[in-house]
Swiss-Prot record:
This is Early E4 31 kDa protein. One of its GO terms (cellular component) is host cell cytoplasm. It comes from Canine adenovirus serotype 1 (strain CLL). It is found in: Host nucleus; Host cytoplasm. Plays a major role to prevent cellular inhibition of viral genome replication by nuclear bodies. Assembles an SCF-like E3 ubiquitin ligase complex based on the cellular proteins ELOB, ELOC, CUL5 and RBX1, in cooperation with viral E1B-55K. This viral RING-type ligase ubiquitinates cellular substrates prior to proteasomal degradation: p53/TP53, LIG4, MRE11-RAD50-NBS1 (MRN) complex, ITGA3, DAXX and BLM. Keywords: Early protein, Host cytoplasm, Host nucleus. Belongs to the adenoviridae E4 30 to 34 kDa protein family. Coiled coil: none annotated. Interacts with E1B-55k.
Length: 265
């Protein structure tokens, strides 16, 4: 039903894992820090030779934020990725580490769009419920990955996930459970890194997709308040002040974690 462990899955207590790579990401990735993770769609992102090297030892948990006593939105954060092989000292695992680190360094640089186009989050989340919340974007290998965090009451969670899946084809995006949250990731192949008009068209397209998703979810029925929440306004303000003016806000005070992801709904 939902993508599970290994190349398209999530980390859990039963899965053996060890930290295999750590990278420092610029502050434009800190929108993901509020969710404690940057999910990585390995099957979509990796070249064939990279898939052969990484095998089935990665998961959609992707990059996990390394929390410390002073995690500030205005500072670059450290992120770690886990490997699920059985021997962290094996030659195969050690050889993967450097390749994986270089891949991650390239991947996180695709988050520049979150700072360059701050209006994108404000526009996409305007008059939209917190249950389907745009978090951030990654531009990587000519594809724009658009991340939405999904959070519904446990009583309707499963039905909502299925409703969203009915609206999203594999070419359009993917719905999955990661370590801390459930996610919808849309894929846009027409965005140009230097073309404002293309990104603006993308934002309208994304809102139309989310409108379709909301209509499907509301058939369950579920009451969704189509307004910009005060919590989202606080997040937008904190991110803008951090990225533009270097104002520090503690990530722990703003972070979002979906309890359903831990309870395996």
């Amino acid at each position: 039903m939902f993508h599970n462990c290994r190349m398209e899955g999530s980390c859990n207590a039963e899965t053996t894992s060890h930290v295999t790579a750590v990278v420092r990401a610029p502050i434009f990735c800190n929108c993901f820090a509020l969710c404690l993770e940057i999910p990585i769609l390995w099957d979509d992102l990796l070249y064939r030779h990279e898939k052969l090297l990484f095998g089935g030892f990665t998961c959609n948990g992707g990059a996990e934020l390394i929390l410390n006593s002073h995690c500030c939105l205005a500072d670059a954060q450290m992120w770690q990725v886990h490997c699920h092989c059985s021997d962290s000292l094996s030659l195969q695992c050690l050889s993967r580490t450097q390749v994986l680190k270089e891949f991650l360094e390239e991947f996180v640089m695709g988050g520049f769009v979150n700072k360059k186009y701050l209006w994108y989050r404000e526009f996409v989340n305007s008059s939209r419920p917190d249950e389907i919340n745009y978090v951030g974007s990654i531009m990587f290998r000519n594809i724009h990955y658009i991340y939405f965090r999904l959070s519904f009451f446990s009583t309707v969670h499963q039905a909502c996930m299925l409703a969203i899946q009915r609206c999203i084809s594999p070419e359009l995006g993917v719905v999955f459970k990661s370590t801390y949250n459930y996610w919808l990731v849309l894929k846009c192949k027409s965005c140009s890194l230097q073309n404002y008009c293309a990104l603006k068209s993308c934002a309208f397209w994304v809102r139309s997709i989310i409108d379709r998703v909301l209509r499907e979810v509301e058939k369950i029925p579920v009451v969704l308040h189509r307004t910009t929440s005060k919590a989202e306004e606080r997040r937008q303000t904190a991110l803008k002040q951090a990225m533009m003016y270097g104002r520090c806000r503690h990530i722990q005070n703003l972070c979002l974690v979906n309890l359903n992801a831990f309870l395996h709904f």
